[in-house]
Amino acid sequence: MSLSKSKVKSKIKELNEKLKLYNHHYYNKNESLVSDEYYDAKLLELENIRDNFPEEYNQVFQKDFSKSVLEKVNHLDEQDVKLKKEKHQKLMLSLNKAYSFEDLERYTNRINTFVGNNHQYILQEKIDGVSISLYYENGILTKALTRGDGIYGENVTHNALNIKDIPKTINIKENIELRGEIFFSLKLFESLKNEFLDKQDGTKNKKWNTPRNKASGILKSLKTTDESSWLSCFIYEVVSPENFNLKTQKQLFDFLKIQGFNLPKFEFIENENLIENFITNFKFEDDQRDYEIDGLVIKLNDLSLYDLLGKTSKFFHHSIAYKFRKKFVMTKIEDIFVTVGRTGLITYNAKLQEVVLNGSKIKAATLHNYEYIKNIKINIGDKVYIEKAGEIIPRVVKLVSPKNDQNYFSPIEFCPSCKNKLSWSENMLNQFCLNPDCIEKKIQKLKYFVSKDGMEIQELGGKKIELFFAKGWVKKIEDIYNLKNNYDDLLKLENFQEHSVNVLLHKIEESKDVYTWKLIAALGIKNIGKKLAKSLVKIIFENDQKNLLSLLEFNYDELEKYDEFGSVKIESLKEFFANDENRNLIQFLDQNGFELKMEKEIIQSTKLENKTFLITGTLEKPRDFYKNLIIQNGGIISSSISKKLDYLIVGQNPGSKEKKAMELNIKIIDEEFLKKMLE
């Protein structure tokens, strides 16, 4: 469902304010409120909204784009900055980011387009630290500036002089500017953290929460501190390398080594085709590495091409940062709790110490069923690794320190809701509450019915279902459509005003005007999803059944002649519609405004007849616009890539589907080509 203009604008404002807050703390208070991954995810979300809703984006900022974090360069607050600010001799920009091999391919393709093919590259570790620029005059270190906002940096020379990894003198008499990263050794950080934590004041947790934050705090302290001797430094850039006859990155690194600087680990890559292989085999999570990295930097080896490739206001085009996504993150199980689903399925879950994984804050994760707990031997207090399964649902993967004993969480015997004894499935993997009167099962069924996967009654969310159930107003689906009888009671509730109650009741009434497949899907019939619900309604219409009661009268054995309906699915339908409670529900819905409705495919032309299409990436208009356009001209929308696909329509940031289409020799087109097909 597409967002309204007002909701799009609200989302833009919300994301912009959040990112402004994060920037303020990062640039002015030397602390990160969120992880890099979380920040990048929110920034990318705002960029996507800007690209997809340009009109709303322009209206929010009224064309004064300096108010947007996407356009704003200077994030330093005049009133907060106490260190002396100085202008960089050359812009100290950040790196553009790549999150996939497709992003990297676009980076190398751009280089090939502008300066030809067959280039060599340098891949170096991207240190998770504080960027620094060092100025040497007549061989003596005279100034050290942080990146700041890329235009102005803070003068931290007094503390940089105390960092052992930074040579105070070098054998270069010409003025030279070098850039790199200040960071904390992980072993030293943990050792010092344990030693000094108790001596800190009330801000101790902030000061020692991450190595980078602590390094930043030390480096930017107003007075010279001995603590700066704890810090380390890698240098990887020479500003204006042509002044020193440096023509390649490889020569530049050799030059820095000779001058006594430490360098991040790097690899020389002969051509772009080897980049993906190197990254695939690179150990991003290496226990032997004594510093934090958050990716790899890919740089064109030929320095003479850098100016030709140009820059944006935020980054240069000659280099890019490949940001790896962590597969796992370590945390601790604080508690184990159980939930009951709408079918009575028992799910075990872990309450976790909060961590961030791939841009998401995670406080809980699924443990699936008891068999899963037993196999991994999980218990409260254990340190575990978690991952985001399918990039959606966090789950516990394994213990940090495997056990040999039987010290793991015991299975529950009774339903946490109705207290009835639980039953095991035949294979002894899952537990179920079979009590038809279980309150939690009923609540979950109601929640599913009004959810996005069901009837999409947005104003009637899960919290309201719980409240109305507790009040006794909504015990079953029929009660939702009788909620208008509780109008006066609703007005007495806290935060329920006349307008909001009227909107709620209007949306409930409005939900009756729905295609029947959506109603069937909302009923939560076992083994029957949206696709089969659509097919069922189409078949019922073909059999000249014209009202909702047809669902009760239809001979479901006739479905045997349709390939998509196997015996298990047919049995599920027969069982559901034979149940007295369900039959009463259908009769109620039929008598209260629900009709048997089928989605009609409006065909404007047959120009795309029997041609299959799949859309990937961000297009000029919402995807639904193009999907409807294809269907209206006789085309078919596919849900996945296969050899049967005729066309892949590609927008910005297309992802892995584009590569898969190339491998299968599927024709790749853009939205302009689609429009030409319809002329």
UniProtKB/Swiss-Prot annotation:
Entry annotated with the keyword Metal-binding: yes
Primary enzyme class: ligase
Source species, domain of life: Bacteria
Reaction(s) this enzyme catalyzes, per UniProt: NAD(+) + (deoxyribonucleotide)n-3'-hydroxyl + 5'-phospho-(deoxyribonucleotide)m = (deoxyribonucleotide)n+m + AMP + beta-nicotinamide D-nucleotide
Entry annotation: catalytic residues: K126
Domain BRCT: 603-679
GO molecular function, one term: DNA ligase (NAD+) activity
Residues at which Zn(2+) binds: C415, C418, C433, C438
Any GO BP annotation: DNA repair
Cofactors (names): Mg(2+); Mn(2+)
Alphabetical keyword list: DNA damage, DNA repair, DNA replication, Ligase, Magnesium, Manganese, Metal-binding, NAD, Zinc
Binding site for NAD(+): D36, E37, Y38, Y39, D40, S94, L95, R147, E181, K299, K323
Role of this protein: DNA ligase that catalyzes the formation of phosphodiester linkages between 5'-phosphoryl and 3'-hydroxyl groups in double-stranded DNA using NAD as a coenzyme and as the energy source for the reaction. It is essential for DNA replication and repair of damaged DNA.
Family: Belongs to the NAD-dependent DNA ligase family. LigA subfamily.
HAMAP family associated with the record: DNA_ligase_A
Protein name as annotated: DNA ligase
Taxonomic source organism: Mycoplasmopsis pulmonis (strain UAB CTIP)
Gene: ligA
